[in-house]
């Protein structure tokens, strides 16, 4: 006959983590998820840029779907989708600050959706930073390689839509009450006030 599992720290309860312990384990996992997503985006961005430089000629488009979708190699001194050209070094410093900020948030990250959005932004920002630092004409002022043209939209690379989609995801999460350092949606202020009144009765 099996004996009863004793209660207390030596029993079964000791094997089940508390809510606080479970939440404490989430940031390292979410940081790993964030970095994994960023690594995938960064790898795709670097590989596709290397292939574009190797096989495409500047100023000569290669048709994918007629004239609507083409491979078109350009060197971009501006931000995503060729915006803010002429401010290369400023954009480099801004992107560097974004990367540092994401790493800081990643240490406190609890939400897996925020990990997805931040990972996409981090991977895209680092992909374009590689060009800023290591491509001509000079460090901090390197021109980003863009190679995909769709209709009237400016030529872009893998990093550009990754940053934009990641940013949109974070905005949506914020609007619907999902914070990066909490599990689930945050409670509205009137819900919290109502709960406090109920507890006081």
Swiss-Prot record:
Catalytic site positions: 146, 160
Record-annotated membrane-spanning stretches: 33-53, 86-106, 110-130, 158-178
Lineage: superkingdom: Bacteria
Coiled coil: none
EC number: 3.4.23.36
Keyword annotations of the record: Aspartyl protease, Cell membrane, Hydrolase, Membrane, Protease, Transmembrane, Transmembrane helix
GO MF term list: aspartic-type endopeptidase activity
Record localization: Cell membrane
GO cellular component term, pick one: plasma membrane
Pfam family, one: Peptidase_A8
Pathway noted in the entry: Protein modification; lipoprotein biosynthesis (signal peptide cleavage)
Reactions this protein catalyses: Release of signal peptides from bacterial membrane prolipoproteins. Hydrolyzes -Xaa-Yaa-Zaa-|-(S,diacylglyceryl)Cys-, in which Xaa is hydrophobic (preferably Leu), and Yaa (Ala or Ser) and Zaa (Gly or Ala) have small, neutral side chains
Membrane topology: Multi-pass membrane protein
Alphabetical GO biological process terms: proteolysis
Similarity section: Belongs to the peptidase A8 family.
HAMAP family (alphabetical): LspA (MF_00161)
PANTHER family: LIPOPROTEIN SIGNAL PEPTIDASE (PTHR33695:SF1)
NCBIfam families with a match to the protein in the record: lspA
Protein's job: This protein specifically catalyzes the removal of signal peptides from prolipoproteins.
Protein's recorded name: Lipoprotein signal peptidase
Source organism per UniProt: Mycobacterium leprae (strain TN)
């Amino acid at each position: 006959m099996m004996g009863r599992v004793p209660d207390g720290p030596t029993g079964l309860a000791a094997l089940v983590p508390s809510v606080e312990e479970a939440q404490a384990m989430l940031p390292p996992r979410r940081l790993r998820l964030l970095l994994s997503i960023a690594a995938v985006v960064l790898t795709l961005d670097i590989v596709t840029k290397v292939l574009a430089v190797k096989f495409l000629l500047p100023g000569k488009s290669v048709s994918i779907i007629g004239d609507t979708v083409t491979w078109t190699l350009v060197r971009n001194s501006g931000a995503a989708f060729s915006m803010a050209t002429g401010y290369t070094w400023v954009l480099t410093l801004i992107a560097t600050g974004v990367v540092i900020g994401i790493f800081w948030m990643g240490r406190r990250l609890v939400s897996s959706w925020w990990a997805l959005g931040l990972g996409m932004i981090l991977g895209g920002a680092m992909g374009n930073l590689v060009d800023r630092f290591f491509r001509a004409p000079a460090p901090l002022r390197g021109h980003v390689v863009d190679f995909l043209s769709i209709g009237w939209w400016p030529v872009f690379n893998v990093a550009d839509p990754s940053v934009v989609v990641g940013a949109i995801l974070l905005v949506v999460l914020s609007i619907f009450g999902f914070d990066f350092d909490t599990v689930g949606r945050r409670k509205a202020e009137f819900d919290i006030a109502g709960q406090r009144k109920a507890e006081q009765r």
